[in-house]
Amino acid sequence: MNNLKKVALTLAMALSFTACVNDNQEAKPEDTQAEMPAGDPKTDTSAENVNDKDPQTVEEETGKEAKDNEDVDNEVKTTGKIEDEPHYGKPIKVAYNGGLCTGAPGIADVRGEFEKRGLEVEFINVKSDVDSIGTHTADATIGHIAKFVPPTINGVNAVFASGAHTGCKSLYVLDNDEINDTEGLKNKIIGFPGAIGSADHNIAIRFLNNDGIDVDDVKYRQVDNAAIIQALESGELAGAILSDEYASQFIENGTIKRIRSLSFDEDFKNEACCINALNGDFVKENPQMAKLYNEAVLETQKWMENNVEEATQILFDNNWADGDFETAVEMMESYNWAVSLEDTEKTLETVIEDYRNLGIINSEVSKDDFISKHWNSLGIKDSDIK
């Protein structure tokens, strides 16, 4: 395949594959050539704000959440009557721009899971799922844990109610014998679509850290998704963090191979990749509605685990996914949609500890405090999900 055809294929896939795109929508174009070791202060997202914007912008956009919600109390207070809740009778706004891995709420709606619980939902397109929760533009969404944790620590008023699924992203290199593990990436560059300090960056350094690689021995660069394969082939990049869906055809044609994975590696495959996040005020003021919403999504995810092809068809029928159907089914099958609440809580604890040790978040942040403030399954246990 000549270079022109490869570029055309890359561009076509960038347009057609929509899974997990929200992880990188916040990236600023001027950061595209950013390159720095992980220890650089600019990579410390505890000093940044939501989604790579400056602190003043985040404070304005989140209604000064960073100050007002430092001690947010997510304890559910309720009369026990859903009719008494201020949002009762109004649709729950769900931030969803389409995609496979964030599709459970849409499938839940099509299957009538919200309606049978007396709920109505409204799906809204947003530029940033994190900001939509922080500003209460949306009541609920699904987003990557790696992306949500740092801004939540910095003040975004989010409650994590359950895991969405496992897997979805991996570390890729060219399919040759030059690099076969993370050791081979020392003194080289890993690229990703997200900005420096984004979920992609954080995933990369967790892979390296788990393998005993000093994260400062590798450099990191933001590269447009459509240009990453070409950057690997030209030698500009030695490795890349990509969604498994986007990478699949390049694996099939022998261009790249996977050397580290959230989906398939023993030390990551049971972790929740994405999280069902709700606005903290919505949960406090409407605990019964929030619980029913979480229940509907969790029961849908359990159904999806056993009915992958039908679930994928629903996404395609509603224009929430496109591209090659069989590839989409394969990707959906690679996720564990029935990830447990217990494993999701453990994932949050592990991520907090890793981020503290790596300097991604303030070292004073306690995983117990974070769990107490931001993890709330709303009274639902794993045994409740049918």
What are these regions (language model features)?
Residues 146, 221, 226-317:
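Pocket-lining segment of extracytoplasmic ligand-binding domains
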Residues 18-19:
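C-terminal motif of bacterial Sec signal peptides marking the signal peptidase cleavage site
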Residues 65-222, 238-244, 255-261, 270:
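Short, glycine-/small- and polar/acidic-enriched structural segments
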Residues 164-175, 256-283, 333-335, 368-382:
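Periplasmic-binding protein-like
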Residues 2-10:
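Sec-dependent signal peptide recognition
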Residues 284-362:
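Secondary-structure end/capping motifs
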Residues 73, 353-386:
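Conserved C-terminal helix/tail region of periplasmic/extracytoplasmic solute-binding proteins
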Residues 24-88, 148:
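N-terminal, intrinsically disordered, polar/charged segments of Gram-positive cell-envelope systems
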